Amino acid sequence: MIGGGLVGTAAAAAAIFALVAPLGVQSADMVAETAPGQHRLIHLQDGTEIALNGDTRLVLDRSNRRTARLERGQAMFSVVHDETRPFTVDAAGTRIVDIGTRFDVLRTARGSEVAVAEGAVLYDPNGAAVRLGAGKLLRRMDGSQIVEVSQADPATVGGWRSGHLVYRDAPLWRVADDLARATGARIAVDPGVANRPFTGAIVVTGADRRGTLAARLGAVLDVTVARQHDGLYLKARAAH
């Protein structure tokens, strides 16, 4: 935890669960969708649990509950393993296959991430075919064939469920995206600092969801936080 961090616990809120298929989604599908700042926990009949972060859209096939498609946002999967029917997640057209596991998948406008807390997954079995064990984090940016694999603390994977956000050399734009997803606040980042790396831990509180985020972010991220009519804007501190 870094000094001046955001302290507290995250409270789950009610989410939107659409049983009626929207335009472009087959009627056999179920859509689970959360607004920014909301969480949702889905229990499947086989005992598998899926926790949804804020601003997330997940599609489940009614005829095959062992298949999910993450269209945007973040979800933590706690899968009851079945070797004869492996659980699969589709993110931006890439399959992630469970091998008895607890894992987190993030889908943003820039790319995808997979982090494993327990067990293992097979990422893109028909392409890159990368096996990820507990404590591994995979990143792949849209439009790139490069798959980056690094270390992650298994204990922090899916920490967003309790408001704990932990980073190691993460760009500020990623931190801002996570905070927006967690709190419901609109947060933009100046291009001059968007790729600045941040290492540390932030714990989001219920108070942050009520609008106190700006007062704390400046010291935590070493930026100037400007209030705008539609949210917050992070930029470099003025030189002294």
Regions found by a protein language model. Name each.
Residues 28-49:
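Short extracytoplasmic/periplasmic juxtamembrane "stem" segments immediately C-terminal to an N-terminal membrane anchor
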Residues 45-46, 54, 71, 117-118:
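A cytosolic small-molecule/anion-sensing beta-strand core signal
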Residues 2-29:
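Single-pass transmembrane signal-anchor helices and their membrane-water interface zones
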Residues 37, 53-57, 73, 92, ...:
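Tight coil/turn sites that cap or link beta-strands
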Residues 86-181, 188:
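Short, polar/charged, low-complexity connector loops/linkers at domain or secondary-structure junctions
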Residues 55-75:
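Short Gly/aromatic-enriched secondary-structure transition segments
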Residues 45-48, 63-68, 108-114:
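Edge/loop elements at the starts and ends of beta-strands within beta-rich repeat scaffolds
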Residues 145-240:
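N-terminal export/assembly leaders
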